[in-house]
């Protein structure tokens, strides 16, 4: 199950998402699963992914600011079912909201 969302974001919020420091992430679970990785760089070449990707054993989400609009995008994938995907969506939005509240 896969889904993409778009939401409004100010320039300041977009910068916070793009420049997230993974050491500031306090969340340990996503959709009931332990978070296995919080990535801001590609594992293969250490290049910036321009946002953040959060991985669990049963799914993941990535959030990144739009380069052309005052918005950000969340990409989600559940390896379980639609209900799990909806929980991923809720938790991903909460994750991004926490990033925005920290600025």
Give the location of each predicted region.
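Phosphate-binding and adjacent anionic-ligand microenvironments
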Residues: 1-67, 71-75, 81-89, 93-103
């Amino acid at each position: 199950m896969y889904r993409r969302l778009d939401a409004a974001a100010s320039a300041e919020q977009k910068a916070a998402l793009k420049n997230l420091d993974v050491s500031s992430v306090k969340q340990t679970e996503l959709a009931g699963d332990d978070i296995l990785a919080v990535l801001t760089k590609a594992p293969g070449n250490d290049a910036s992914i321009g946002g953040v990707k959060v991985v669990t054993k049963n799914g993941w989400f990535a959030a990144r600011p739009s380069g052309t609009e005052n918005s950000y995008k969340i990409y989600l994938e559940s390896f379980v079912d639609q209900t799990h995907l909806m929980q991923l969506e809720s938790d991903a939005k909460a994750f991004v909201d926490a990033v925005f509240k920290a600025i």
